[in-house]
Amino acid sequence: MKPALTYYALLVLLLASCFSCKTDSEKKKFVIGVSQCTLEGSWRKSMLLDMKVQASEYPGVSLLVEDAADSSLLQVEQIRSLIKRKVDLLIISANESEPVTPIAIEAYRAGIPTILVDRKISSDEYTTCLLYTS
């Protein structure tokens, strides 16, 4: 597994483990919203597969994946929809930084931990950012 993909898989595993210690009566589904700029290309397909595999290890975790198909306008609308669905965590791989910045800030200010992958936004209002450098 490539180093960047290992980080993503570990991230999903770590977040899932945070919510696996509750009793049955306390458990609720932990929903991870994933906003991908595109699902084309082997790297992005591998990343998504790794996320799905890791999430499947935890019955209390589900992934909601959105493919923006290289459209920043579509990505903004999809992220807005994920916010309205009250995801517990939002992972964003922005198509372009500038158009996605306001909606990413909105998610962060709504109390949704917001993780940026592969591309930063034009703000420091996010939880963490994972950038791969060779």
State what each model feature region is.
Residues 22-31:
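Bacterial Sec signal peptide processing site at the extreme N-terminus
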Residues 132-133:
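Conserved small/polar residues in nucleotide/adenosyl-binding loops
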Residues 87-94, 115-117:
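Periplasmic-binding protein-like
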